[in-house]
């Protein structure tokens, strides 16, 4: 989600380009990193071509066989249409990249709905939909 705080000239040399001129999908390449889910027992191996941090908990819940919250179920469905999303943009299931504020995207309303849910989860102190974001405690 962020880069080390190094001099801009370092990135310019590394990329053979001016980092300030990178946009969209080119800028996205700077944030691409592999991930691994490790278990001390056999689990189904899977190669995930493209994902984002917001979906890692859905993969973990699936591998561990943990019951998902409504929110994790929502994210699981969302990742079918939009397998990767972040502050710069997102990819659809066909591999097409969209800038995050692209109002002509067929996914614009879906992204807007996701942003509202994220806001409610993070900042909705009085009106947070707790039953959606958390599992009920077992007695």
Please place each PLM-identified region on the residue numbering:
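Solvent-exposed soluble domains appended to multi-pass membrane proteins
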Residues: 2-139
